[in-house]
Amino acid sequence: MTENIHKHRILILDFGSQYTQLVARRVRELGVYCELWAWDVTEAQIRDFNPSGIILSGGPESTTEENSPRAPQYVFEAGVPVFGICYGMQTMAMQLGGHVEASNEREFGYAQVEVVNDSALVRGIEDALTADGKPLLDVWMSHGDKVTAIPSDFVTVASTESCPFAIMANEEKRFYGVQFHPEVTHTRQGMRMLERFVRDICQCEALWTPAKIIDDAVARIREQVGDDKVILGLSGGVDSSVTAMLLHRAIGKNLTCVFVDNGLLRLNEAEQVLDMFGDHFGLNIVHVPAEDRFLSALAGENDPEAKRKIIGRVFVEVFDEEALKLEDVKWLAQGTIYPDVIESAASATGKAHVIKSHHNVGGLPKEMKMGLVEPLKELFKDEVRKIGLELGLPYDMLYRHPFPGPGLGVRVLGEVKKEYCDLLRRADAIFIEELRKADLYDKVSQAFTVFLPVRSVGVMGDGRKYDWVVSLRAVETIDFMTAHWAHLPYDFLGRVSNRIINEVNGISRVVYDISGKPPATIEWE
């Protein structure tokens, strides 16, 4: 039997903050399993989960509104530590007898709080000291409402001039509230506070580590599928690659990977995937060359959303056909990760407006009665990468920049043609190669080239040429929700432009995209 890595667990109730997933990732980084649930859970669900502690997230609502979200009352009766963050602190204060008022001024940004009373949450944690020796903490505030009276059995732990109750605590019940965000890096000691709560106050052991996660996943896969055969769509992306390696470790040759080469991949990507997984790691791979089929389906289509749907539909068709050729396959594996599960769950915190449709395997083949294997569904992307390293996958492959599911289908603007894809592949490879050579690749969050269906006059030797235009795009971001364009050196951009125009016959002009997100999106389509 493998160790129970879910034995100690934290429940995070989501009130809608943009930082809630970051809270969960921080808890996981501390080696402790946690799950993220909507705030309106039932007492029975909490009892069934049996958490070692509960965190109440921040949120955009006002606790002073009549129908604003509230924590289930059982949260405060379960006998486990509770940590309220921002809105989570406000609803805790209000529900336990304190008072919250709407503030005329939003407090947003850096603040320094002074610790005025001892608490297990911040004992020995400080960024600086006042003249009379009291600890100061540098924190990140983001709130409109504020607590104006704490519950009678709480004490004030820290305050600022504008926020008299920046930290409150009931040490006996192990209830804590902070009016700032410990999960963001701007709160310099935030990770230590979370560690103090999770590891010391909740007494959770660090059982959630890459090696133990792998052992647990392998055991669970074997228990789920036994000696049955499993099929997986392998794209060469991080999620499907790590899924393939976990399944291979668990069931060996009973796994068949289907690699669909849609003609929309990066330069030499198909060969690299086949070499690494087939030749090097010894996985059983079915290679399906399907470039003509995808490009035929895309012919004449200019609309980005329609292109995405065509690519998704054709992939499912091709995958289904290959699956039907295999005998006795009982299970379909997918690289679903935890954020996919969170996004697809019906959450009372509301849904973001759909900007672009997400590309994924469209479901099980209709003719096949297969079960679903999702070994990554509890993991965040950063955890998937760490597991990939532990399984022996190369760093460069696991940490390369994001690549959209539809591939070059949404990086060739307008109609997708083989000629355009071939030009774009070579131009993009030059851009990425130069970024690596200049030690800039890991300094930007994402970089790629876009093919513009526009011809431009150029000069080559004594002649004029009338060829295509490409745009370089590089951004810096923490969460991909917002992004700044990367200020790459002019001489570097000039070098990339010269190489592309001289080495890629058919491109006459290179431009650089200096749009931020918002108002632009990172991808052009």
Curated annotation (Swiss-Prot):
Signal peptide: none annotated. Disulfide bonds: none annotated. Pathway: Purine metabolism; GMP biosynthesis; GMP from XMP (L-Gln route): step 1/1. Keywords: ATP-binding, Glutamine amidotransferase, GMP biosynthesis, Ligase, Nucleotide-binding, Purine biosynthesis. Residues 208-400 form the GMPS ATP-PPase domain. Homodimer. It comes from the Bacteria. GO terms for cellular component: cytosol. InterPro entries: Class_I_gatase-like, GATASE, GMP_synth_C, GMP_synth_GATase, GMP_synthase, GMPS_ATP_PPase_dom, NAD/GMP_synthase, Rossmann-like_a/b/a_fold. This is GMP synthase [glutamine-hydrolyzing]. Residues 9-207 form the Glutamine amidotransferase type-1 domain. PANTHER family: GMP SYNTHASE [GLUTAMINE-HYDROLYZING] (PTHR11922:SF2), GMP SYNTHASE-RELATED (PTHR11922). The keyword ATP-binding applies. It comes from Escherichia coli O127:H6 (strain E2348/69 / EPEC). Pfam families: GATase, GMP_synt_C, NAD_synthase. The keyword ATP-binding applies.
